[in-house]
Curated annotation (Swiss-Prot):
One of its GO terms (cellular component) is cytosol. Member of a network of 50S ribosomal subunit biogenesis factors which assembles along the 30S-50S interface, preventing incorrect 23S rRNA structures from forming. Promotes peptidyl transferase center (PTC) maturation. Keywords: Cytoplasm, Ribosome biogenesis, RNA-binding, rRNA-binding. Its main location: cytoplasm. GO terms for molecular function: ribosome binding; rRNA binding. The gene is darP. This is Dual-action ribosomal maturation protein DarP. It comes from Enterobacter sp. (strain 638).
């Protein structure tokens, strides 16, 4: 038996792992599956978008055509197409797509919040009358005071007479126009 020099252990491959600066990051199989499912859900969200919303996203032609195809497919084929879209997303940087989707969702949420605010203002106008008109004048100085008071008067009469709230709808539309002209 031949003796080896004592430094033979230094030449073993893989022994120098602790000397490297690069860390090995172990990712579990279930984490990979969770990420893949998340990307598939992102693809499903994009499939639910309309053509105008898709135009606002910066998508490459292959991904765009896959999404448009998924919009036309029903049942089992759609599931397979969504998996393909998820696979395509794994090969791309999805952060810009996520940001654009968040922007679209946020715009919708802002619009819903604005409508709720306008409904509250309308209800206050009908209930409180002139006090609430002063608040509206503070928000929108260019309000036609006479038209607004006329609508409020009609809305109160309709409410007392249990009639359909036509004037209340007109108040809401008028407030929405004011809000849109402001922004």
């Amino acid at each position: 038996m031949t003796k080896q020099p004592e430094d033979w252990l230094d030449d073993v491959p893989g022994d120098d792992i602790e000397d490297e600066d690069d860390e090995i990051i172990w990712v579990s199989k279930s984490e990979i599956k969770r990420d893949a499912e998340e990307l598939k859900q992102l693809g499903a969200e994009m499939v639910e978008l309309g053509k105008n919303a898709l135009d606002k996203l910066s998508l490459d032609p292959d991904l765009r055509s896959a999404i448009e195809l998924a919009q036309r497919i029903k049942k089992e084929g759609r599931r397979r197409q969504l998996q393909l879209i998820g696979k395509m997303l794994r090969q791309r940087d999805v952060e810009p797509i996520r940001q654009a989707l968040d922007k679209l969702k946020n715009r919708h949420n802002q619009q819903v919040a604005l409508f709720h605010k306008l409904e509250q203002i309308r209800d206050r106008l009908i209930e409180q009358g002139d006090d609430a008109v002063a608040e509206v004048l503070n928000l929108w100085p260019d309000v036609d005071r006479q038209q607004l008071r006329s609508l409020i008067r009609n809305a109160k009469k309709e409410k007392e007479g249990n009639k359909p709230p036509k004037s209340a709808r007109l108040i809401f539309q008028y407030l929405r126009e004011l809000a849109e002209n402001e922004g």
